[in-house]
């Protein structure tokens, strides 16, 4: 067996780390993907380049707790805080998916201090495409 590395987590001494540059982007878009298992909040600029992101799992929830509205709220607050460091003040919101964290994430973006412009649902709707999974019998 090969020997384990001593410090696998962080950069070594003398090694330069890339410092995250502060961008000044006043207007962006918040993409909220809310599935049955998780909620992912991504804040981008108008070209679609990612400024900040957070998810229920990234915030610290595991398993079925990731799909709760409270986890979505914390994820949205976390992403909004990171985006405000880059100067984002106003966002358009694009919501995708059937999950339980949709409305909560939008409300917490507003509560975090971001001004919400338009809200649009971009959930893909099949024109009778793939066969859905079979019904659960409990």
Curated annotation (Swiss-Prot):
Report the domain of life of the source organism.
Bacteria
Q: Which InterPro entries match?
A: Ribosomal_uS11, Ribosomal_uS11_bac-type, Ribosomal_uS11_CS, Ribosomal_uS11_sf
User: What Pfam families does the entry give?
Assistant: Ribosomal_S11
Composition-biased stretches (Basic residues): 13-22
Gene Ontology MF: a single term: rRNA binding
Alphabetically ordered keywords of this record: Ribonucleoprotein, Ribosomal protein, RNA-binding, rRNA-binding
Question: Region (Disordered): which ranges?
Answer: 1-23
Low complexity bias (residue ranges): 1-12
Tell me a GO cellular component: ribosome
Ribonucleoprotein found in the keyword field: yes
Q: Subunit structure, briefly?
A: Part of the 30S ribosomal subunit. Interacts with proteins S7 and S18. Binds to IF-3.
Q: Name the PANTHER family on file.
A: 40S RIBOSOMAL PROTEIN S14/30S RIBOSOMAL PROTEIN S11 (PTHR11759)
The job of this chain, per UniProt, is described as: Located on the platform of the 30S subunit, it bridges several disparate RNA helices of the 16S rRNA. Forms part of the Shine-Dalgarno cleft in the 70S ribosome.
NCBIfam families found in the cross-reference section: PRK05309.1, uS11_bact
Query: Which family does the record assign?
Result: Belongs to the universal ribosomal protein uS11 family.
Please identify the protein, giving its name as recorded. Small ribosomal subunit protein uS11
Source organism of this protein record: Mycobacterium leprae (strain TN)
């Amino acid at each position: 067996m090969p020997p384990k590395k001593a410090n696998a987590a962080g950069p070594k001494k003398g090694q330069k780390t890339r410092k995250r540059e502060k961008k000044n982007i006043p207007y962006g878009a918040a993409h909220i993907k809310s599935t049955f298992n998780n909620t992912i909040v991504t804040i981008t600029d108008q070209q679609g380049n990612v400024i900040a992101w957070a998810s229920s799992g990234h915030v610290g929830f595991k398993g079925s707790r990731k799909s709760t509205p409270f986890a979505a709220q914390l994820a949205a607050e976390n992403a909004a805080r990171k985006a405000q460091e880059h100067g984002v003040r106003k966002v358009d919101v694009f919501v995708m998916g059937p999950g339980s964290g949709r409305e909560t994430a939008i409300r917490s973006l507003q509560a975090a201090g971001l001004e919400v412009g338009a809200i649009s649902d971009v959930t893909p709707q099949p024109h009778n495409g793939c066969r859905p999974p079979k019904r659960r019998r409990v």
